[in-house]
From Swiss-Prot:
<protein>
    <recommendedName>
        <fullName>Flagellar P-ring protein</fullName>
    </recommendedName>
</protein>
<dbReference type="GO" id="GO:0030288">
    <property type="term" value="C:outer membrane-bounded periplasmic space"/>
</dbReference>
<dbReference type="GO" id="GO:0071973">
    <property type="term" value="P:bacterial-type flagellum-dependent cell motility"/>
</dbReference>
<dbReference type="GO" id="GO:0005198">
    <property type="term" value="F:structural molecule activity"/>
</dbReference>
<comment type="function">
    <text>Assembles around the rod to form the L-ring and probably protects the motor/basal body from shearing forces during rotation.</text>
</comment>
<keyword id="KW-0574">Periplasm</keyword>
<dbReference type="InterPro" id="IPR001782">
    <property type="entry name" value="Flag_FlgI"/>
</dbReference>
<comment type="similarity">
    <text>Belongs to the FlgI family.</text>
</comment>
<dbReference type="Pfam" id="PF02119">
    <property type="entry name" value="FlgI"/>
</dbReference>
<comment type="subunit">
    <text>The basal body constitutes a major portion of the flagellar organelle and consists of four rings (L,P,S, and M) mounted on a central rod.</text>
</comment>
<feature type="signal peptide">
    <location>
        <begin position="1"/>
        <end position="22"/>
    </location>
</feature>
<keyword id="KW-0975">Bacterial flagellum</keyword>
<keyword id="KW-0732">Signal</keyword>
<dbReference type="GO" id="GO:0009428">
    <property type="term" value="C:bacterial-type flagellum basal body, distal rod, P ring"/>
</dbReference>
Length: 360
């Protein structure tokens, strides 16, 4: 099953690599057209005994301070916070957001709360990197997991200490932005000199003037021509199609065993030997009881079982130069995803893999 999955992934990437062009908006980001991040500290209340414990002093102090601001002085030592949890609230604000716009927020416990299920986030100011308050968040927390706990056992699904509040924040003031500019930068998501020059040439041809200039492998600086507003000009630019130059790359996720290979990966003839040595050691302590009424003592005697299994090496010679032939050759010798990762690393070290090897 693992081998089939790898073959399907390769086939998909081959189709992608044969695409003739892409819109500029799909491969690049226009200066200023990005998300902004906000963060805040708040309290979630109304939990069913799954909140922070007494050891979480900042939760106790935060609750006492909030009640004091409401005109209710309390002694922090008398506060029980099992129905309250201290949380960090994070949000991603869309570009060019205006005052009054609503957006989602994510709520994450920072204490020892067991679950945020059923809780309500109290009014929490959200600040930007400059320390200024841009939005206020409040609302019912929706949790994708749960925790069921008894005296002797507990069952947890997903992460109940993280939740979301759809449209839980409202922007109080516009984010800083100036619409009066004469030039703009376009940043490629994947820096490449060939693609940068292609973007430059496509824009210049579309407007009939040399208004675009590739500054480096990632940046194209564009002057807005006379007679165009920034919105009209950028709307036309971002929909222009440009041919892209993809880099031959093999991506390996060592934790999950997933291998992604592009269709333009070149491989020279190489012989691959795959084998493994499995050593299994089991410790089974055995309790030995003395005979009844004897002066002996109960002893624990170790029982060790050692098994060593060496699989025969499988040798295959890869003569093809395409990704599909490489995968078929590795599958033909019954290589597992882990072994395929080791093989690719060895082929790269031998200089037979003509592609960048990236290990996640």
């Amino acid at each position: 099953m693992a081998c089939k999955n790898i073959r399907y992934i390769v086939s998909l990437l081959i189709l992608v690599s044969l695409t003739f062009g892409a819109r500029i908006k799909d491969i690049a980001t226009i200066e200023g057209n990005r998300y902004n991040y906000l963060i805040g500290y708040g309290l979630v209340v109304g939990l069913k005994g799954t909140g922070d414990g007494k050891a979480t002093q900042f939760t106790v102090q935060s609750l006492a301070n909030m009640l004091r601001r409401m005109g209710i002085p309390v002694d922090p030592r008398r506060i029980t916070v099992k129905n309250v949890a201290a949380v960090m609230v994070t949000a991603k604000v869309p570009p060019y957001a205006k005052a009054g716009m609503r957006f989602d927020v994510e709520v994450s416990s920072i204490g020892d709360a067991k679950s945020l299920e059923g809780g309500t986030l109290l009014m929490t100011p959200l600040r930007g990197p400059d320390g200024k308050v841009y939005a206020i968040a409040q609302g019912q927390v929706i949790v994708g997991g749960y925790e069921a706990r008894g005296r002797g056992a507990a069952q947890v699904k997903n992460v109940p200490t993280v939740g979301r509040i759809p449209n839980g924040a409202i922007l109080e003031k516009d984010l800083p932005f100036s619409a009066d500019f004469k030039e703009v930068n376009i940043y490629l998501d994947e820096p490449d000199f060939t693609t940068a020059k292609n973007v430059q040439d496509v824009i210049n041809r579309a407007f009939g003037k040399n208004i675009a200039k590739a500054v480096d492998s990632a940046t194209i600086r564009v002057k807005i021509p006379e007679g165009y507003s920034p919105v009209d000009f950028l709307a036309k630019v971002e929909n222009l199609e440009v041919s892209t130059s993809s880099v031959a790359k093999v991506v390996i996720d060592g934790r999950s065993g997933i291998v992604l290979l592009g269709g333009n990966v070149s491989i020279e003839p190489v012989a691959v030997a795959v084998g493994s040595l499995v050593v299994e050691i089991k410790e089974r302590p055995e309790v030995v009881q003395p005979p009844p009424l004897s002066p002996g003592e109960t002893k624990v005697v170790p029982r060790t079982e050692v098994k060593v299994k060496e699989e025969k090496k499988r040798l295959v010679q890869i003569k093809g130069t395409t990704v599909s032939e490489l995968v078929d050759a590795l599958n033909s010798i019954g290589a597992t995803p882990r072994e395929i990762i080791q093989v690719l690393q060895a082929i790269k070290s031998a200089g037979a893999l003509k592609a960048k090897l990236e290990v996640l």
